[in-house]
Amino acid sequence: MTKEDNIEMQGIVIDTLPNTMFRVELENKHVITAHISGKMRKNYIRILTGDKVTIELTPYDLTKGRIIFRSR
């Protein structure tokens, strides 16, 4: 699967879960579980409840995603 196959969406973090997992509500009101991408983890980017984030989803499982950007 190539990078172009992934779906990018905007969302808001509504809950923090253990092991750097987050519950995110997307713009279309769906709630998914997301984890932090490796570069965000490496650079110690903090994500808190209420932050606007960009999520990358695969077409195979639309209930799990990866947080790739935190908006200011």
From Swiss-Prot:
GO cellular component: cytosol
Keyword rRNA-binding listed: yes
Keyword list, A-Z: Cytoplasm, Initiation factor, Protein biosynthesis, RNA-binding, rRNA-binding
A Pfam family recorded for this sequence: eIF-1a
Primary localization: cytoplasm
Entry's transmembrane regions: none
Disulfide bonds: none
Listed InterPro entries: NA-bd_OB-fold, RNA-binding_domain_S1_IF1, S1_domain, TIF_IF1
PROSITE patterns named in the record: S1_IF1_TYPE
MF (Gene Ontology): ribosome binding; rRNA binding; translation initiation factor activity
The family this protein is said to belong to: Belongs to the IF-1 family.
Complex formation: Component of the 30S ribosomal translation pre-initiation complex which assembles on the 30S ribosome in the order IF-2 and IF-3, IF-1 and N-formylmethionyl-tRNA(fMet); mRNA recruitment can occur at any time during PIC assembly.
Stated name of the protein: Translation initiation factor IF-1
